[in-house]
């Protein structure tokens, strides 16, 4: 009798449906580039891992690195605006903000239509919001910031992200130093090992059925957002 019950239990376990794991998504964003060898190393690492990210590019750097700007676009990454000069937009007039975006727009690869503006430093104002709305841009914030620009300690950068990241987060990183790039690639490896899918911000919004609103800010897109 005991043997029969054991066999029955095994059969039940075989036919019981396996509960699917909840999908986990994170968007990685990179500010201030392109930056020559560091952006190139980051793009190589993203390509090797089959991962796409969102790049918030400065116009004056796009001017200096047109080939890298084109490569970012060609390899399926998302491009957003980060101003032309990287000056604080908070106290700029609408006219000056619009001029910054128009200068950057002229340097974008053909066919690239940004969906986001991330003001330098995240500093926003009514003028920033009004210009973003007029140019059909959502304002992109973030929910995880390891302050990678302030340290060369890759382990500290990685810990600051991996300790705090949750599904739906938008992570702020930079491609301006070797330590930032090495940390970013290690973070990606760790997230992939934890079954996260790393996506662009636009892709994350689509997965969350979130309609991007011009002139409105987003900082994270958790489930049911």
Language-model segments: what does each one mean?
Residues 38-41, 87-112, 121-167, 180-186:
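Alpha-helical scaffold elements lining the catalytic groove of polysaccharide deacetylases
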Residues 31, 46, 79, 117-120, ...:
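Divalent metal-coordination and catalytic microenvironments
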Residues 30, 57-60, 81-83, 119-121, ...:
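A cross-domain feature marking catalytic cores of carbohydrate-active enzymes
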């Amino acid at each position: 009798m005991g043997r029969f019950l054991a066999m029955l239990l095994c059969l039940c376990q075989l036919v019981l449906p396996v509960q699917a794991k909840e999908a986990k998504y994170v968007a990685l964003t990179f500010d201030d580039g392109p930056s020559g060898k560091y952006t190139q190393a980051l793009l190589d690492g993203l390509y090797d891992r089959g991962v796409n990210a969102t790049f918030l590019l400065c116009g004056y750097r796009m001017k200096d690195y047109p080939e890298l700007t084109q490569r970012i676009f060609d390899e399926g990454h998302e491009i957003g605006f980060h101003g032309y000069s990287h000056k604080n937009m908070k106290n700029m007039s609408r006219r000056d903000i619009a001029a910054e975006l128009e200068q950057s727009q002229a340097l974008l690869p053909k066919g690239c239509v940004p969906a986001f503006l991330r003001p330098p430093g995240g500093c926003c104002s009514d003028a920033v919001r009004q210009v973003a709305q007029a140019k059909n841009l959502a304002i992109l914030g973030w929910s995880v910031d390891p302050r990678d620009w302030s340290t060369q300690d890759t382990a500290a950068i990685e810990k600051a992200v991996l300790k705090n990241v949750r599904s739906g987060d938008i992570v702020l990183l930079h491609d301006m130093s070797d330590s930032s790039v090495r940390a970013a690639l290690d973070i990606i490896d760790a997230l992939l090992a934890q079954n996260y899918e790393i996506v662009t911000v636009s892709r994350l919004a689509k997965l969350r059925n979130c309609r991007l609103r011009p002139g409105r800010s987003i900082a994270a897109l958790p489930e049911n957002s």
